[in-house]
Amino acid sequence: MNKIWKLKNVKVGVAPILWTNDDMPELGGDISFDQAISEMAEAGYQGTEIGNKFPKDEKILLRELKKYNLEIASAWFSGYIISDFEKNFQDFQKHCLFLKALGAKVVVFSEQTYSIQGQNKPLFKDKPYFTNQEFENLAQGLNKFGKWSKQHGIELVYHHHMGTGIQSLKETEKILELTDPEFVSLIFDTGHFAHAGEDIVFCLKRLISRIRHIHLKDIRKEKINELKTKNLSFLEGVKQGIFTVPGDGDIKNYPLFFELLAKNNYQGWLIVEAEQDPRKANPLEYAKKAMDYLRSLISW
């Protein structure tokens, strides 16, 4: 029997990607926004992140969320600091102001210059790498973006991600070392670190001081091995079922992970995320399965 760890000042949400995949509309394209948010609430979650099917008008979105007592935790932003700083900065400012109007406190940033996460390229064979100069340029840009967002009440959290220039623990540590902790924090994604071959507890110990947002998923190792053997892309891997919800895959040290979060007084959102094919993995069923698993390990 695992000890249940108390996490103070934590909220638990679920990402809309369980229902509809923004990168592959064929996955859950027939599922409505209302179905998704009603099922999030039914499964016991307090909030969510923004997906493509969400209303773009903040007043309408807030009204719909209020029906189910849900909050917006954050939203993804595709960064192009290395390749197109000025336009990207303008887009970022608009994005942050939208999030602020929704009551969010965090913006999820991922540098997409050279990214293959949405392309039909072998994920491991064609992984992009940033030069030292590109790391420096990215860090300087992140400091500027993060300083601006902080002035407007939004914290920038960097998302390490498969198929990008910042995927591994080493790459994540490098960008954190180069950036100002006052302006740049980290979103810790258990699924992406595990997918990259990292141990989530080891990574957590190394990075805990910078973590302000967390995505929780699980992985299926046999599917990752298949992806490597067949030279599949990131999105093909998703379709094959590489990811699932916490407790349903091969990450076995979640109890220790949550113990460390509690002992380090983590504050912020925990967002359950697992991009799967909703025809194979019923979103409501998997959202409830994840909630049951979390409640067996933590209280909040």
UniProtKB/Swiss-Prot annotation:
This is Inosose dehydratase. Pfam families: AP_endonuc_2. It comes from the Bacteria. Its EC number is 4.2.1.44. GO terms for molecular function: manganese ion binding; myo-inosose-2 dehydratase activity. NCBIfam families: myo_inos_iolE. PANTHER family: HYDROXYPYRUVATE ISOMERASE (PTHR12110), INOSOSE DEHYDRATASE (PTHR12110:SF41). It is an enzyme of class 4 (lyase). It comes from Mesomycoplasma hyopneumoniae (strain J / ATCC 25934 / NCTC 10110). Its cofactor is glutathione; Co(2+); Mn(2+). SUPFAM superfamilies: Xylose isomerase-like. It catalyses: scyllo-inosose = 3D-3,5/4-trihydroxycyclohexane-1,2-dione + H2O. GO terms for biological process: inositol catabolic process.
